């Protein structure tokens, strides 16, 4: 299969992966309206084309939390990454490291902190959920500090798991799930050999290190379901802020008032995110939510954004809407499932190329020159038609 664009990796991943894994990452919550709008809304953001600007000195380099990034992109935390390629977290992290951008390890990664961190030249980031078991949270934070992780990404939009209907149909959950997954693996021999057999152990490394025993897929589902904490509040985060010495980023912000609360709390950054449309269907896409949040807190806190970003043009759009940096999730996982480290490396090269084309044709020589002025105002920052709040009957 020819890979000429980031979107090609999705089709390739669907061929490679057993359905329960493909649909787990590809799907969203409920009827998946927000999942689709994340992509659709961002695609409607119109950029101003500018010409004759002498773009010979164009640079994508930027600085975030005292780290130099080759471009304003980081790899987002994605659970079960090691089920998509053999020791997938190690491979994805290596590609990000070689590109000069951060990799974020998920709490529920297959490969533990101690396996991934020593393979990298630059410090990785670590993501943590709000969980009832505070002992696990402290243990994970201690291990992340010991491994030299620089930035903590604290996910707050998952006090309870979203209703993901695709999972029951695909075999990730539902009746006879284990038998269905086994049969799917048999029907996908490339994955079964590379990951199913040679990618073991298939436990959740960060959790296994704490519990002292392997945790398989069923254990993962059960343990997480019993440990998400709906009682969490800003006050419960104070001990984490005191414990963690480095930058702390709050992930899962969609409302300007929550963004202001993050500033008052003392966070170093926020991620404007709806969890890739995987938590609550019907909420704003990140592209819809970002401009108002940027108006509220830009300059007071670093603004990152995810959800719906599929290519370099989308990165430029998000920055023009108010983000400082973006996180890639599904896009890099499709590439990882297709070709491992080489796939992620090629994806990042494609995104870099697409960003350079977009910046050259909009007259932005540097990341700091991408702003609201880069947008066609009728379809730009105000976005009265494309990105106005959804009205009744407006669902796609």
UniProtKB/Swiss-Prot annotation:
Entry annotation: catalytic residues: 275 (proton acceptor)
What are the names of the required cofactors? FMN
Annotated catalysed reactions: (S)-lactate + A = pyruvate + AH2
Signal peptide residues on this chain, from the entry's feature table: none
One GO cellular-component annotation of the UniProt record comes to: plasma membrane
| Membrane disposition | Peripheral membrane protein
Keyword list, A-Z: Cell inner membrane, Cell membrane, Flavoprotein, FMN, Membrane, Oxidoreductase
Entries under InterPro entries matching the protein: Aldolase_TIM (IPR013785), Alpha-hydoxy_acid_DH_FMN (IPR012133), FMN-dep_DH (IPR000262), FMN_HAD (IPR037396), FMN_hydac_DH_AS (IPR008259), LldD (IPR020920)
Name the principal localization, coarsely classed: membrane
Molecular function via GO: FMN binding; L-lactate dehydrogenase activity
Record: residues binding FMN: 106, 127, 155, 251, 306-330
Q: What class of enzyme is it?
A: oxidoreductase
Q: What is its EC number?
A: 1.1.-.-
Tell me where in this chain the FMN hydroxy acid dehydrogenase domain is found: 1-380
Localization in the cell: Cell inner membrane
Which residues does substrate bind?
24, 129, 164, 278
The processes (GO biological process) annotated in the record are: aerobic respiration; lactate metabolic process
Q: What function is annotated for this protein?
A: Catalyzes the conversion of L-lactate to pyruvate. Is coupled to the respiratory chain.
Task: Output the NCBIfam families linked to this UniProt entry.
Answer: L_lactate_LldD, PRK11197.1
* Similarity field: Belongs to the FMN-dependent alpha-hydroxy acid dehydrogenase family.
Q: What is this protein called?
A: L-lactate dehydrogenase
Native species = Salmonella schwarzengrund (strain CVM19633)
- The gene behind this protein is lldD
């Amino acid at each position: 299969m020819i890979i000429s664009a980031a979107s090609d990796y999705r089709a390739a991943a669907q061929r490679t992966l057993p359905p329960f894994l493909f649909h787990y990452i590809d799907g969203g919550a409920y009827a998946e309206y927000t999942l689709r709008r994340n992509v659709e809304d961002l695609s409607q953001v119109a950029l101003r084309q500018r010409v004759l600007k002498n773009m010979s000195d164009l640079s994508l380099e930027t600085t975030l939390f005292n780290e130099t990034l080759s471009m304003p992109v980081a790899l987002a935390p994605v659970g079960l990454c090691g089920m998509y390629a053999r020791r997938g977290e190690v491979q994805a992290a290596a590609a990000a490291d070689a590109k000069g951008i951060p990799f974020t390890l998920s709490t529920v990664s297959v490969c533990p902190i101690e396996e991934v961190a020593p393979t990298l030249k630059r410090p990785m980031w670590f993501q943590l959920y709000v969980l009832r078991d505070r002992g696990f949270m402290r243990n994970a934070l201690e291990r992340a500090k010991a491994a030299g992780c620089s930035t903590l990404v604290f996910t707050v939009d998952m006090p309870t798991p979203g209703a993901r209907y695709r999972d029951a149909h695909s075999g990730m959950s539902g009746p006879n799930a284990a038998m269905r997954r086994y049969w799917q693996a048999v029907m996908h021999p490339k994955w079964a050999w590379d990951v199913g057999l040679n990618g073991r152990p298939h436990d959740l490394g960060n959790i296994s290190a704490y519990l002292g025993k392997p945790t398989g897929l069923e254990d993962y589902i059960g343990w997480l379901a019993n440990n998400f904490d709906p009682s969490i509040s800003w006050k419960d985060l104070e001990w984490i802020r005191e414990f963690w010495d480095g930058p702390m980023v709050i992930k899962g912000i969609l409302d300007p008032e929550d963004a202001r609360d993050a500033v008052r709390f003392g966070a170093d950054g926020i991620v404007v995110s709806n969890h890739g449309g995987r938590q609550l269907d019907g909420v704003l896409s990140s592209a819809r939510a970002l401009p108002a949040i940027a108006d509220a807190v830009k300059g007071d806190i670093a603004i990152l954004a995810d959800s719906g970003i599929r290519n370099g043009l989308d990165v430029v759009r998000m920055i023009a809407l108010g983000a400082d940096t973006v996180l890639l999730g599904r896009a890099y996982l499709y590439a990882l499932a297709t070709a491992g480290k080489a796939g992620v490396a090629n994806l990042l090269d494609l995104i870099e190329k697409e960003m350079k084309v977009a910046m050259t044709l909009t007259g932005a020589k540097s990341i700091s020159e991408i702003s609201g002025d880069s947008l066609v105002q009728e379809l730009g920052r105000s976005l009265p038609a494309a990105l106005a709040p959804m009205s009744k009957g407006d669902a796609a």
